[in-house]
């Protein structure tokens, strides 16, 4: 097969391939960028594989960066763009189901492609657009099939994360995991415990954000991978209930965790425990806790001015996306209009600050000043006083007399 219209991202890298070939070595585009080109999807990173060893690549190009020489990877800098070139390699035994004991550089493209995870990712393309397909990856792309390269158990023993990648690609591409690969995942699902949570986290979120998350989630459950993910082992029924939602589209990681928190019926501390076990950032945790409270307020028709002001429109819309999936969402435009009606969106928009209170209202720095600012802020938000400096100073003086 020949790719007639090679994407610009590849065209820009063609001089790299040509220079390697002129030096007497093979070089091909490989991996996800080739797969996505064949699927008509936008491509991101352009990866190159070559028969040249790292030291040979460094002799061919004047500007290189050692990004992973021990694994055969060198970055070539070309007109401000970096291209990672990885030497064809084979990998020996895997003691821990995630890292090879030994990486051996080879001159054979076939040997390199044999060690890749899935047939759809084991495709290469030369500088003329010709596709090298040694494992029927093109057929699987056409038929929407996720299949391990060669013996699936061997692939999953090499890196157990590949099991999560398989079901993630099922969601991302709306493909189905073929039977032998599926059975190998189910048989070896316990090996997922060997993998760092951070790596599983990435695949899990990509699964939920995929084109057909129900497909990926169904296979995630059926293969029993869920049993070996943090705090999911006893959540089969809750996870399965997500499959029953008719409108199931998530757009951000925050939406993913907010939906799960709602389905699991978690409160603040439980949400924090779940997300910490998945190694989420503190910012994500705070965001999801806030959004989860807003989901409940939407459900109870208790979205008030204070909720809009304290959370901001982004968190409100995240909550509403989950509310819509759950069947009780509001119109986004109505929410935006309500938010836009707020007199101020944050304390920074107040026409006075602590310095003004000191100089013009005689307020001394300290607890009283904080209380006065809080009171004035709340009065502005609720529309009880206008956000005008003179008016605010007068109100500050009154509050000072009353000691707030």
From Swiss-Prot:
Transmembrane segments: none annotated. CDD domains: NT_ClassII-CCAase. Keywords: ATP-binding, Magnesium, Metal-binding, Nucleotide-binding, Nucleotidyltransferase, RNA repair, RNA-binding, Transferase, tRNA processing. One of its GO terms (molecular function) is magnesium ion binding. One of its GO terms (biological process) is tRNA 3'-terminal CCA addition. ATP binds at residues 32, 35, 116, 159, 162, 165, 168. It catalyses: a tRNA precursor + 2 CTP + ATP = a tRNA with a 3' CCA end + 3 diphosphate; a tRNA with a 3' CCA end + 2 CTP + ATP = a tRNA with a 3' CCACCA end + 3 diphosphate. Pfam families: PolyA_pol (PF01743), PolyA_pol_RNAbd (PF12627), tRNA_NucTran2_2 (PF13735). Its EC number is 2.7.7.72. InterPro entries: Bact_CCA-adding_enz_type3_sf, CCA-adding_enz_C, CCA-adding_enz_firmicutes, NT_sf, PolA_pol_head_dom, PolyA_RNA-bd. The keyword ATP-binding applies. Mg(2+) binds at residues 45, 47. SUPFAM superfamilies: Nucleotidyltransferase (SSF81301), Poly A polymerase C-terminal region-like (SSF81891). The keyword Magnesium applies. Its cofactor is Mg(2+). CTP binds at residues 32, 35, 116, 159, 162, 165, 168. Catalyzes the addition and repair of the essential 3'-terminal CCA sequence in tRNAs without using a nucleic acid template. Adds these three nucleotides in the order of C, C, and A to the tRNA nucleotide-73, using CTP and ATP as substrates and producing inorganic pyrophosphate. tRNA 3'-terminal CCA addition is required both for tRNA processing and repair. Also involved in tRNA surveillance by mediating tandem CCA addition to generate a CCACCA at the 3' terminus of unstable tRNAs. While stable tRNAs receive only 3'-terminal CCA, unstable tRNAs are marked with CCACCA and rapidly degraded. Homodimer. A single active site specifically recognizes both ATP and CTP and is responsible for their addition. Belongs to the tRNA nucleotidyltransferase/poly(A) polymerase family. Bacterial CCA-adding enzyme type 3 subfamily. PANTHER family: CCA TRNA NUCLEOTIDYLTRANSFERASE 1, MITOCHONDRIAL. This is CCA-adding enzyme. It comes from Ligilactobacillus salivarius (strain UCC118).
